[in-house]
């Protein structure tokens, strides 16, 4: 299987437009594991195989256990996630499924109870950004399996 659109060739500036969002998020107020957990969950909801592969590998590189990764599809029934993570995952699903009834006040209030205003803004940007990447990846039929995480040595 080959991708049906090669964005780098077809629209060289596309990645230049998206990359600043990820650069901002890399140094935002949220911890890296939470960001990748949110990205993986949104990718599961959207059915983006390429992004599922990527963020699964990123989480493993950060030390996430297989138990937490396998349980993510059923996070509401799984004991592996903190209240903060649960609030982030609920908000992730609400924003990702926004066409099914808008982002609910219940999920927003749960998130607001766990995150500062800055963190909640960063979380919402992370969710919005991964949803854009999911749509780009699905539309192009990007092939999963080749991504390898960059492991950064601790300072």
Q: Across the structure, where does each feature detected by a protein language model lie?
A:
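Hydrophobic alpha-helical segments
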Residues: 1-155
């Amino acid at each position: 299987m080959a991708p049906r659109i090669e964005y780098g060739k077809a629209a060289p500036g596309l990645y230049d437009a998206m990359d600043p969002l990820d650069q901002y998020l890399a140094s935002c107020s949220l911890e890296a594991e939470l960001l990748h957990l949110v990205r993986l969950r949104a990718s599961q909801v959207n059915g983006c195989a390429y992004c599922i592969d990527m963020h699964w590998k990123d989480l493993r590189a950060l030390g996430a256990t297989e138990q937490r990764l396998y349980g993510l599809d059923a996070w509401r029934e799984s004991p592996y996630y903190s209240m903060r993570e649960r609030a982030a995952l609920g908000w992730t699903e609400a924003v990702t499924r926004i066409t099914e009834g808008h982002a609910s006040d219940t999920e927003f209030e749960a998130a607001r109870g766990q995150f500062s205003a800055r963190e909640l803004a960063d979380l919402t940007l992370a969710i919005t950004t991964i949803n854009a990447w999911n749509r780009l990846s699905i539309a192009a039929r990007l092939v999963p399996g080749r991504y390898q995480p960059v492991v950064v040595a601790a300072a």
